[in-house]
Amino acid sequence: MPAKPPALKTPEIPVAEYARRRSQVLKGLKNRIGLVHAGSSDAALHGAFRPHPHFEYLTGITDEPGAIIVLDPTAPAGRECTLLLRPLDPEIEKWDGLREEIGTPLRERYGIRMVFRLGRLGIVLNDCLQRTRRVACLHPFGRLDQDVSPDLETFRSLADRYTDIVIEDCTGIIANLRAVKSKSEQAMIRHACDISKIAYLEMLRTVRPGMTEWDVMETLEHGYRSNGSRGPGYNTIVGAGLNGTVLHYTANKAPLQKNDLIVIDSGADFGGYTADVTRTIPASGRFTERQREIYELVLRALKASTKAVKAGCTFAQIDKASRDIITKAGYGDRFFHGIGHHLGLEVHDITPKGPLKAGAVITIEPGIYLPDENFGVRIEDDVVVTRDGCVNLTSGIPKSVAAIEKAMAAR
């Protein structure tokens, strides 16, 4: 059995960085009040809570459902940020564990001086509105696949009490900040990619016909958790044969047949940041001639798009680099999705308008899908955009035909 890889050095985002982010938002707000909600949770029943990514980005707090941070650039120095937490509830704490009293240790850990319980929200907002009647909407009211933002209820309540308030669209403030990753954020995503690499290498050593798609998924996700991840950053896709032509296939229960190609789209989460990796591998350990032909075409497209990445370019230009190659080969209609997306606290991270900036982290994922031949191919890497190119965070995960077959031969 191969030796266990050495433990990875664990990065983190310092408290001071969260404070800098809040300062940047305060600067963008000018004389407007901003609210960011953590979101609600049924964690008492399901044991899982993930805050709204805007809230996590500004605070680093991941275990306080219902929390709100109020940002007021018009407040006296040291009081511009107010964090409001749910009241203590002994009955809930019997089930979920004790929560900390508000005091100096908690304030220092969060790096926020003004921390109160949610019952004080009305007092805090009333104080803010004595200085300004301008209120910022920092994130959209809702999306088709999500509940309506709690902002809407807050805005309605404020408008009922203060008929002269002005609510302004400031959704670009946090979006533009999140689109450019700091060195600490890049380190977090790199770590998620490194954990993914360990898991993918182990998976490649174990895959064989007769296993199921579920077995492949379990091998990957066990590899994530045993190397410091809390699990996958999104639902793992393992599509064998015809299933590999379904972009968001998640049943993951079919058996692996000898001649199947398997499209595997999965990435580890670390500290809220996720990797997003896709590899396509042969169940038998060796590509057929036809599988190799299509695979090499997609790989060539991936390399062309990767070469096109640099600060100032657009996703359209990156997409064109792949699409030209695939279309020229006669498979343009079999590449029916975009080339990639931003990556960060969300797997499809927030995407502001305009060209890419240095520090953005994006995916590149061309594909060709041939349901009439019972297979598809997609290959995906994660890269950091630099001034004159990019840094590939997932280059260590086998990608060439030779590298994949070599890794699978070690089983």
Locations of regions flagged by a protein language model:
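Active-site neighborhoods and metal-handling regions in enzymes and metal-associated proteins
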Residues: 1-411
